[in-house]
Regions:
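Hydrophobic/aromatic-rich core segments of domains that either
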Residues: 13, 17, 21-25, 357-447
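Low-complexity, Gly/Ser/Thr/Pro-rich intrinsically disordered linker/tail segments
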Residues: 428-486
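Inward-facing hydrophobic residues that define packing positions of alpha-helical scaffold repeats
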Residues: 34-35
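Intrinsically disordered, low-complexity N-terminal segments that are enriched in acidic
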Residues: 50-52, 63-270
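TPR-adjacent "capping" and linker segments in tetratricopeptide-repeat scaffold/adaptor proteins
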Residues: 2-14
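Acidic low-complexity segments
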Residues: 15-16, 23-30, 238-349
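Alpha-helical solenoid scaffolds that mediate protein-protein interactions
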Residues: 38-39, 45
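Active-site nucleophilic cysteine motif
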Residues: 314-321, 351-366
């Protein structure tokens, strides 16, 4: 069975001009219709050959170039999902902000809009803002956050990580033992719709496949224990899987969730790259392109050349790239990676992104500069909460693999904490759960339907009767049961 997620590697093939113009103008239904026509086209029947002429050689691309067909296939699903991401009219978003922020005015809204503070697209001729635009404004504008009518609980203080940094400098490492409960399943509404569709086809159950992230073996994680499952999984991927999961497959007549409880030890080992001499010869692994999001575009090549001009020390090159990302890229909630064609190139142009976008930008710039770099992701696992997070790794001999958490570094830059900004160049903290060590890696067993996130896997994936679910169709849980600093 074909893995449709592999089509994303061909996104840089681009779109035919008419489809591109329709997409940019937000006429998604017309664009989908045009894509369908292109995918159905018989090139052999349309080739340059007058009626009644002698037979020509067999057309070498009877259905068009494979790369273009793959790009069109991925873009069709992107076009279908985009209107579900950009849902708010200006009046709806203004009303949301006025309900959240004391004294928020239409003039403030217009000024923020003119400054590009809110992500938007045209959708079928109307300007529509991303569904979580209000959350982004509150997260990125301190003046608005200070005027919230119902402010959230304060975030945990960074002081614990300053103390952890001091411990790591003093003793070489810090550790925590973490027990976490995670789960995933269909929303009741999605299950009811799927069951109705199944019954209309003469079936009495929904065939469900589920992948739930699990902690993977890596230098930062040890003592991994899978304590319990809601029901025995059909398969548990090995600890060294690129994106490790537990996998279930079931025919459901009633909706239910799938979950696990696991425990592991997280250890943050201290590295001091700025005060260690690199070897004169460095390795070349993990320095290649990885499409679509780690593409060596002309713009990224030019940026990497500017950042590393005059430098020969790989540590200084990596540090210059880290400085660029953490000092210039503003944290900004993102549309799903599914609907983005190249997150790193877009970040370098817009200077905004979330943790994964910042990590990808660091990785691709390092690779262009000849510095091995990898993706790593999973969860933030603090005593108070668990949540999604991504970061990067880079390799410099003789030190080996080190970390770069650019979004944490950017937070420290905003707070004026240079000590901790530098900490996240080379180091992490203990409050992590690592499930993924590669971007856009397949599962074991593979998911062939379009994933909710073809790049990463932080909360899991669900497939119902061969269709990948996403957004409000899926319900997930990540809960800290026990957290002990050791």
């Amino acid at each position: 069975m074909k893995d449709w997620n592999e089509c994303f590697a061909c996104l840089n093939a681009g779109l035919p001009d008419d489809v591109r113009r329709l997409k940019e103008a937000g006429y998604y239904q017309l664009a989908i219709a045009r894509v369908d026509a292109l995918l159905a086209e018989d090139w052999a029947a349309a080739q340059n050959q007058p009626a009644g002429a002698a037979a020509l050689p067999v057309n070498p691309t009877p259905q068009g170039p494979d790369a273009l067909r793959a790009a069109l296939t991925a873009e069709r699903e992107i076009l279908r999902r985009l209107p579900q991401v950009y849902t708010l009219s200006a009046s709806q978003l203004l009303a949301q902000m006025q309900q959240l922020v004391r004294g928020f005015t239409a003039e403030e809204f217009a000024a923020l809009d003119a400054a590009g503070a809110m992500d938007w697209r045209f959708v079928e001729g109307e300007k529509r803002y991303i569904c979580h635009a209000a959350d982004t404004l509150l997260a990125t504008h301190a003046d608005l956050a200070a005027r919230q009518l119902d402010p959230p609980l304060p975030l945990p203080s960074w002081e614990r990580y300053e103390a952890q940094h001091e411990q790591m400098v003093r003793t070489g490492s810090a550790s925590a033992e973490i027990t976490l409960q995670a789960g995933i399943g269909m929303s009741d509404e999605a299950f009811a719709a799927a069951l109705a569709a199944a019954r209309a086809q003469g079936r009495d159950a929904v065939h469900v496949r589920v992948w739930l992230p699990l902690p993977a073996a890596c230098p930062a994680q040890s003592g991994i224990e899978l304590l319990s499952f809601t029901e025995p999984p059909a398969f548990v991927a090995p600890e060294d899987a690129a994106q490790r999961t537990a996998y279930w497959e079931a025919d459901l007549t009633e909706n239910r969730r799938f979950g696990a409880v696991y425990r592991y030890r997280s250890t943050a080992h201290y590295a001091d790259p700025l005060h260690t001499a690199p070897d004169p010869v460095q390795p070349a692994f993990d320095t290649e392109e990885q499409l679509p999001h780690l593409e060596f575009t002309p713009y990224l090549r030019a940026l990497a050349a500017q950042l590393t001009a005059g430098l020969t020390d790989p540590v200084q090159k990596a540090k210059r790239i880290y400085d660029y990302v953490t000092l210039n890229v503003h944290y900004h909630f993102q549309p799903p990676y599914f609907v983005q064609e190249n997150i790193s190139d877009a970040c370098a142009r817009s200077r905004r992104g979330d943790c994964g976008v910042m990590a990808a930008t660091f990785i691709v710039l390092c690779r262009i500069a000849g510095i091995p770099a990898q993706w790593q992701s999973g969860l933030v696992a603090r005593p108070e909460l668990a949540g999604c997070h991504d970061w990067a790794m880079f390799y410099i001999a003789p030190m080996g693999w080190m970390y770069a958490d650019c979004s944490a570094g950017a937070s420290m830059a905003r707070a004026g904490n240079e000590t901790m900004r530098l900490h996240y160049f080379g180091n992490l903290d203990t409050d992590r759960m690592v499930a993924n060590r590669a971007l856009c890696a397949p599962f074991d067993p593979p998911m062939c339907a379009f994933r909710a996130d073809p790049c990463d896997n932080q909360v899991g994936e669900v497939e119902a009767d061969g269709v990948g679910l996403y957004g409000e169709q899926v319900v997930t849980e990540q809960k800290i049961l026990e957290h002990r600093y050791l």
